[in-house]
Each structure stands twice: as C-alpha cells, then as structure tokens.
C-alpha cells in the first residue's frame, strides 16, 4: 500500500539504531502478533534474530460518545524477540485462518475512497464499529477449532499447555474457550480489566506481565491465540 507515512517498523528500526535489520509493517489487527511471529519464524531459516512488535493507538479510532465501544479499548505496545537455536524449543505448531467475507462485522473506520474511479465520494467514518453478537459467535466457534488444530500439529495435549495467552478482547470469550477445552480458568490469565482491549499488543503485554511476575518461565509450553479484525484467527503452541 502506497503511503506518505513511514512504516511504524521503519520508525522503530531507526529509533533503536538497528541499522543492519530490515523492517516492515504487517496488518492483521488483533491477530497481528501471532501472524507476525509466524512470518518471523519462517525467516529464521535465513536470518539469526528478529523482533515482532504489536502496537496500537486505538484511542484515535474510538467514538467517545459511543458507550458500546469507548469503554473497551486501550493503547499499548509489546515486542517479542526470537532467534535461531538448535535447542528443542520454539514454535511447535500453528493454525492461521482468515475470514474476509465476515470482515464487515469488525471495522476500524474508513479514511479514504474505497473506489476512486467510481466518481462517487465515500462518506468517511473514522470510528471503530463492531457487531458484538457476530464477533462473539465467531470467536467462540472459530478460535477453539484453530487452537485444536495447532495442538494437533504440535502433538501437544490441551492438559500439557501451561498457559493459554488469548487476545484480551472479552472475558466471556476467554472463559468460554477455557470451558470448551476443559481447562481451569487459572491457565487463561486476563488483564483486560486494567488495560482494555489493546488489539495486536494484548498478547505481548500479557506475556511481559506474566514473565515479570515469574509466572511464565523457560521450560513451559505456552499457547498464543489471536482473533479479531479481518476477520482473523491465529493459534500457536510455543515451547519456551
């Protein structure tokens, strides 16, 4: 996509002085960190190390007069560094899915003419909109299927996962998925009560908080599960 703006990745690369690294943006909304880790992991066959960052400023997209969305979202950023290793750790299995035909159920506003050759001027709406019922039904139906597929590919039983780090969208969705897999809710940590829904940043922020608290540590098996705009779903099983 052509833009007059520098990519966020290029800005970060310059700011941290990573002059030998190439940088690019990837857009997958609330599944962004999971999709980004998938791409970065595939690049480790040719490169040594990479950083995947999920960052969102959702306050710019929220209509503060719309009480159905204004109270739900937050701004945030988090990064994950991965590197090539000969140890038996890393990404063990994943499942990524996109449902573009359902994308209208979760949109973050329109900032330009979708078809400049039509001669019509589109009405611009910069605010976030969602069909809450459809998004909930989508998440509780598609997320378990993607997670189950990732577990099978990783040859890991649900009971053997130490923690499930889900996108922090809705406590009811997280609780529903925990129940679906017969797992205690303690294995599904949540922080949306303090941070809100930070979209692509949410899994990374949660991971950092749990590592700082000493709850997540090397030797564990962790699931990352993103879902949201697109609509998209991504589930990964990591051995750390």
Regions picked out by a protein language model, each given a short descriptive name:
Residues 145-162, 210-215:
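Phosphate/pyrophosphate-binding loops at sites that engage ATP/ADP/AMP, CoA/4′-phosphopantetheine
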Residues 24-50, 80-82, 200-216:
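Active-site-proximal alpha-helical scaffold in enzymes
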Residues 23-33, 72, 191-199, 226-227:
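Active-site nucleophile and cofactor-binding loops and adjacent substrate-binding regions
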Residues 41, 47-77:
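Flexible, glycine-rich active-site loops centered on histidine and acidic residues
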Residues 1-3:
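Short, small-residue-biased leader/transition segments that mark boundaries at the very start
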Residues 8-18, 41-45, 68-72, 181-183, ...:
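A glycine- and small-aliphatic-rich helix-loop capping segment at beta-alpha/alpha-beta transitions
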Residues 205-225, 233-240:
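Catalytic phosphate/nucleotide-handling subdomain of diverse soluble enzymes
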Residues 66-137, 141, 145, 227, ...:
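Condensing-enzyme catalytic core mediating Claisen C-C bond formation in acyl metabolism
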């Amino acid at each position: 996509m052509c833009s007059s703006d520098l990519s966020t990745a290029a800005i970060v690369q310059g700011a941290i002085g990573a002059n030998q690294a190439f940088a690019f943006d990837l857009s997958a909304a609330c599944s962004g960190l999971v999709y980004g880790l998938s791409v970065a992991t595939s690049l480790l066959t040719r490169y040594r190390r990479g950083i995947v960052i999920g960052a969102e400023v959702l306050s710019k997209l929220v209509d503060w007069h719309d009480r159905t969305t204004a109270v739900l979202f937050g701004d945030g950023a988090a990064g994950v560094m991965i590197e090539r290793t000969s140890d038996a750790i890393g990404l063990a299995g994943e499942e990524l899915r996109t449902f573009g035909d359902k994308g209208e159920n979760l949109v973050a506003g329109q900032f330009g003419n979708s078809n400049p050759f039509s001669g019509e001027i589109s009405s611009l709406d910069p605010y976030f909109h969602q069909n809450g019922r459809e998004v909930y039904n989508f998440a509780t139906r598609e997320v378990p299927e993607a997670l189950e597929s990732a577990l099978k590919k990783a040859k890991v039983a649900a009971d053997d996962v130490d923690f499930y780090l889900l996108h922090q969208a809705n406590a009811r969705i997280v609780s529903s998925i925990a129940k679906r897999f017969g797992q205690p809710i303690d294995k599904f940590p949540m922080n949306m009560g303090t941070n809100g829904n930070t979209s692509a940043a949410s899994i990374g922020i949660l991971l950092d908080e749990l590592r700082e608290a000493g709850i997540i540590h090397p030797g564990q098996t962790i699931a990352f599960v993103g879902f949201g705009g697109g609509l998209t779903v991504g589930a990964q099983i990591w051995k750390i």
